[in-house]
Amino acid sequence: MPYSSQQNGYTSASTSRLSEQTSSHSRSSREDRHLTEKGRRPPSPEARHRSDRDYDRRRSTEYVRDDDYRRSSRSSHDSRYADAYDHWRSARSAYSPTPRDDRRDEARNDLSSTKRHRSPEHSTSRLRHRSPESAHRRQNGTANRLDSKPDRGGDRKTGEALDSGRSRWSQRAYEYDDWRNERPSARYERYRHDREPHRSRREDEYETKRSRDDSNGNSIYAPTRRSRSRSRSRSRSRDRYRSRDHSRERRRERSRDRSNGTYSSRDDRRPKADRSAHTIKRDEHSTRLNGTSEDSKDLRHESQRRVSASVQSASEGPASTPVARAVYIKHAEVDQEAPAPPTTRDYHSCPQRWPDQADSAVRASSAPNGSATAPSRSDRPPANGSSGRHSPRSLPTREKAEEARTSSTRRPSSQTNDNVNNSRDPLTQRKATSERSFGHVLLPHELPVECRGKNYMATATYKEGVKSIYKSAADKHLVDVDTRDPRRLGKKSSRYRESLHSASFRWDSNSRGKKPLPPPRNLVLTNLSGLLQPHQILLHILPHGRIESSKLEIDPKIGQSLGIFRVTFAHDFDEHGKPLESMPAGQNPQHGAKVAKAACLALNGRMIGQTRAQAFLDRDGEVIAERIKAKLAENEHKLRPTIVPPAPPAAASSSPATPSTTKQSMPPPQVPRGPKVFMPAAPSPSYASSPASARANTDRYEYSATSHSRYRSSYEESRKLASSETYHRRRGTEEYDTYNRSKPYADAQVPAGSRSETRKDIKRPDEEILNELRDKKRPYVHIPRPKNCDIDVTSVEAQLRSTAPIWVREGQKGFYAAFHTSKEANQCKVVNETLTIGGYTLQVDVRSAPSQHAPSQQIRTPSGKHASVPLSMPAPPKQERKAIDTGLRPPTADEKLKVDWSAAELQDAVFRMLQKELADTFVRDVKSRVVGPYLTAYLKPDGEGGKMLAKATMKKPVIPTSINDHGTTLFEATGEARLPSFRKLAGAHPKKKASDADTTTSQAKRDQTDAKKKRGHTHRSKVHRDRDVSSSENESDDMERGMVVAARRNSYTRSKSSTKRRGAAAWLLEASDAEAGTDDVDSTETDALSRSVSASVEPTGEEQIEVDVGAKAKKIPKVKAATVSKKKGTTAARKKLDVAPPEAVVEADQGSETATPETDVPIKTAAAKAKVKPAKTSAKAKSALVDPFEAGLVEDSEDCHYLRLALEHLSRTGELASEHTLPDEIELEVEAEEQAMAAGGIPKHSTGSARTEGYYRIPPEQKAMHLPDRNKATEDVDTSSNAQILQSARNNRADSRRLVLGIEQHKRETATDTDIFKFNQLRTRKKQLKFAKSPIHDWGLYAMELIPAGDMVIEYVGEVVRQQVADEREKQYERQGNFSTYLFRVDDDLVVDATHKGNIARLMNHCCTPNCNAKILTLNGEKRIVLFAKTAIRAGEELTYDYKFQSSADDEDAIPCLCGSPGCRRFL
């Protein structure tokens, strides 16, 4: 499609009704080029061209303007040159085909009307030949033709002229051939037989000349009537004589041929010479388009020669100059309205045919490549100055567009046609003509209806089924203006690199050097809010990838979030970059480093919560460590005091110093509630001072009104605690009163430096200060001063300001603060237990007034519950010993309730608690390592203590009292160490005499001993309780247990003979007492106690005897002294050796817990009294016998063993033993092993060593005997009281009856609203419990705080299943070997199974006298098992409840009970 068609468009367009494309040369699609002319084309002057029936003049405007429904047989040529009036077809005759319909299309344009007029007359002539004369061509001039008015109703020719036989050449073919020549060439070739050979002109001049020639008879052109009738109208065709069906078929065929691009030479009826002379444009033939055919080359050279000839003839023709000038001037005016770009050629550059030009002159071909074999209408440039279809279009630029606008508005000069033609070179014009390449773009008349006449064009190649996009052609120029040639762009001014890029390769096995670290896949987020939870932060991180681990960093001091979050992303690739095989199926592998990098870029600077987070990548934890360190330093800096101490402390100091942080100038706040440590409560309330260096240089007068108003209330409360005398005292002459009630801030303007310097110079000797206190009888507080420290009196006064001392003096050893009464001094101790000044912790020691007799002796006033006792009594002489003074005390109830405290207070509290624990550990270490071995060595039988005990047991009944006194002295000498209790040994007394007086004396002594024993038991229980409660760590029990083990290991070296010797001696003692007929019960109990104590110390042989003592203590009756026959003597002796009374066993266990040394002196003493003699020997004779041990008869363990065997044989048979009568050693060992197995003990090792025996099971009861954590709930129970035992038994029976009647009824009786209320309270505040090893069975549950009676302890949680399911689970557990099941029955149908799912409540053990009971509560329709405290439970006491198993001792599967309580039922 030529560029001109896109450039100017058409005012009206039409489409064909047929399938082929409509020609661009259709008269219905051309613009009205004559609208710009002064006149319109006149109608045909011939009468044969006129008709009374001209339907075009009577048609409506719509029909005239748009004839889209009409058929057109014109081919689809690409351009139409409507404005080129001087475009001549060729020198030879041209043929115009008749239109398809019976009427000829004649577009006659008018200035005021665009109607198309049609002539209904039929053409009767087959051919109309053009006139070969020049006078019939354009010699009359185009201007006259344009200026002439149309002759609408002119007179027609006479019949003579019409009937003339001469054929006449029609001048219309020459005057108005522009619209005819634009018809497609195919029409001229195919319908040559329909063309009229005679064309007539319509100008008046031509008609006048013809009439003149006719009148003169000289005209040879006058046509005959036949020819005139034959060529009456061009619009008439012989096709109307054909059948319509045949015409339609031919139309379809021609349309099909044109659409397929086929052409047949047989349709052309012209001679071969005429066909080659007349150029035909055919876009369908590629050979002609490309100019490769021989005919195209020949025609191209011929056309060039004809162009030169035509140009030469045009320049020589004088008659054509005025006409051409007029035509060019007229078209110049038209060009002013239609601008054209300068790159395109206008109509002046086209070769013209002038009237005097030869007929064979043909214009040059427009295609340089010879695509057109002959000049055609499409080769001329359009009237608007646009270039041809194949012309090379240069890129439109702004300069060219400006030049186009300038040339379009410039008036053409009035130069002659010669100058115009001479100014343009035909060869240059030919070169400027480019080949056409727009056949693939839709033509304007093929555009949609809404896009026609608007200068629109398609933006892409037309494709069937694809919607095309149309835009204005003017926009294309705007887009192309910005297009630039990238080759002409300037080079970038970039700097050259100084070095080459370093190549990076993936490290593999062939690489050298150290393997590089993997890329980081840890992401660290900082600057987060401390209130954000981890799940809130993960919401921002999870969208980036899968997370392997995450952690929110916590401040170790205060337990608050640091605002630092660490995330590790999952990595699913190995070292070689391959996905891991362990990755789940269907999961996409993730590269942790890439995900971490993307997350870091996305999260850095994002708002998370209320802050903007900062993201960092961390490879091995270095980044997060630095961030945590910086954050902790920042937090510490915020809490750092702003007031600097006056003088830094010295480097070396003998006093314990605590680094302080902050301290207010008023009474110190309470100690924060730190980790719970269960220590006995202090007898009196006390307040701890918080470490603060702020008051180091703060004078008591130098604090602002703001601080005064802040602490005024606390200050007044502390003042009210003091005596009323403080408010009315005045300054004395000899006293320096440091506080004046009337003027508390009178000296506020005095500089602190001057006052401190003044006070610093006042330093008195300690004797002078003490003499002053002695004279005034003032109790005082002594504050020792550390060495090499610079603490002045002003700082101490500021610390003691809340308690208002009379004066504060500085001595050589410390500071002294005087008070009026001891109550004020004790109050100062309560408020200020320790003082923290300048980083030093100073202890406050309350002392009474110095004594008049002993000025140097002073006594410490206790700060406990006896602190309010007046200190008027004389002070006892002070013992010179170094006591461990921790300076700490357990937190009070008020301190426990405090929750708001600063970091400095927390630091001080933690330091004091650690100091307390270290002091306790040190005391226990001294007991176990220093005192314990010393006592063990002292109480050995061959040592001093052992001999004293032996003498006291045999001869002197009063000596044990002195031994106890000596033991008391030892207890005082070793500080707070608690020695083993020897009350049982002290209660032992000699055998009864045979006389009545001795019997009476013995009875009186026995009563007195019983009373002492009860008092001693009560005292020991109290000591035991204090000791158990004060222990806050399990290490204390571990240390004591280690001490006991050490003592036992020392005793393991004793041989079996020595062990059996002691047993034989005891048996001899019992046998002699039985034969003598004694009936002393206490003596027998004492001997049994001696054996039990020895057994508890040496586990070699006697440990096996104690196995079942705890389990059968309730069923064993007391051993009564009676005369035993010889037949039953051995059996009785063995029973006494195997079984000891329960009281003795309990005492033995307690003794082993407190590192009781070996005490076999009483056994030796008893054995010494044993004598082998007849049964009826008098008491006097017995006392005269020689002791075999003292006589040297028994020297070692072997002698003792054989002596025992001999005595057993003698008692059994009544005969002396000999070699033949003694039993075999193997038989004795087997018998002893059987006895041990029957007693439940550990059997004897067959190999002689436990290491070579392998693994064997130790019964739980055997383990329980050696556990240090004895049940604290039963240790302090008084064995003498049977009321509680009976009450417990009644309760157990009542509980059993309730269980039989139904737990549901029991629930309704006990579950009240109060219980539900307590259960709701437990949800908010749970009891502090812990689990640890229990002597009853495996693990146990212990209380960590005091639980009052009736409070809810814990809920029993587990899976709620039906009874049938619980039975099956129990069997399944037994098959799996799991005998520790946790099934708790709720009612008759439901059971709670806590075996796999539950809480620590399942660890509660059974006890026959429990301290908890279970209740079933119904909350929201759901049954809950809740455990309540039955009695008050102390801290450290084990929680137990009754399992209520319905079994007895007769059952085979009865489970023995190991609770060890006085009311134990022996079986569960």
Curated annotation (Swiss-Prot):
Catalysed reaction equations from the record: L-lysyl(4)-[histone H3] + 3 S-adenosyl-L-methionine = N(6),N(6),N(6)-trimethyl-L-lysyl(4)-[histone H3] + 3 S-adenosyl-L-homocysteine + 3 H(+); N(6)-methyl-L-lysyl(4)-[histone H3] + S-adenosyl-L-methionine = N(6),N(6)-dimethyl-L-lysyl(4)-[histone H3] + S-adenosyl-L-homocysteine + H(+); N(6),N(6)-dimethyl-L-lysyl(4)-[histone H3] + S-adenosyl-L-methionine = N(6),N(6),N(6)-trimethyl-L-lysyl(4)-[histone H3] + S-adenosyl-L-homocysteine + H(+)
Annotated stretches, region: Disordered: 1-439, 636-737, 848-884, 986-1103, 1141-1162
Main localisation: nucleus
Domain Post-SET: 1453-1468
Entry-linked InterPro entries: COMPASS_Set1_N-SET, Post-SET_dom, Set1-like, SET_assoc, SET_dom, SET_dom_sf
Ranges of compositional bias, category Basic and acidic residues: 28-40, 46-89, 99-109, 120-136, 146-166, 174-215, 236-287, 294-305, 396-405, 713-722
Molecular function, one GO term: RNA binding
Listed GO CC annotations: chromosome; Set1C/COMPASS complex
Recorded domain comment: The RxxxRR motif forms an adapter helix that bridges the nucleosome and ubiquitin.
Assembly: Component of the Set1C/COMPASS complex.
Protein name: Histone-lysine N-methyltransferase, H3 lysine-4 specific
Organism listed in the record: Mycosarcoma maydis (Corn smut fungus)
Taxonomic path: Eukaryota, Fungi, Dikarya, Basidiomycota, Ustilaginomycotina
Gene name tied to this protein: SET1
